[in-house]
Amino acid sequence: VLELKMILAVETATAACSVAVCDGSKTFFRYSKEPRSHSEKIISMVGDVLKEAKVSFSMIERLAVTIGPGSFTGLRVGFSVIQGLAFARDLPVVPLCTLEVLAATYRRTHIEKMGDGLVISLLNARMGQCALGGFRWDGNFWSNEIAVCLLAIDTAKRLIHDREPEMVVGDVD
């Protein structure tokens, strides 16, 4: 039997900045889409979400952070915060793929409508390229059906057309 842990997670790889606390049954989160403000907002967001969840930092058993793809500066903000928190209490850190988190967020917010179809996640990588990954939920776990890759936007459009995903999520202008 898998024992669920109290987890504090941060996502700073995209234009949005988010923090969540999850105990396996309930999730509390804060989300900010204010550009270029991750470093200014994240610590107060951690405090706010812990307060809302009625959880003290001493109750956190594990930390999670997105490791990319994504904004280099944004990723460093998330890494720095999680590294500091992990060091303070010698907590384990779970690395998460940003594109898989985007797919999981879609599933969480559309669970009643979601089938078992492919979800393709995209992030703008600039210079006419995007990071792309394709994921399928089997009822228990995500499988990585299209390996995370960097593609020209036109190539990504063709791949999406050919694969006919249930949903495309992410951030490409």
Spans of model-derived segments:
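Glycine-rich nucleotide phosphate-binding loop and flanking beta-alpha elements
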Residues: 16, 71, 129
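Surface "functional belts" at beta-alpha junctions
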Residues: 2-3, 37, 92-173
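DPxDG-like acidic metal-binding loop motif
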Residues: 62-98
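N-terminal beta-alpha supersecondary unit
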Residues: 2-67
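Stable alpha-helical structural segments in soluble proteins, enriched in small hydrophobic residues
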Residues: 49-53, 88, 106
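Residue-level signal for well-ordered, solvent-exposed loop/turn and beta-edge residues enriched
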Residues: 25-26, 71, 140-141
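Short amphipathic alpha-helical face segments that pack within enzyme cores
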Residues: 41-44, 80, 101
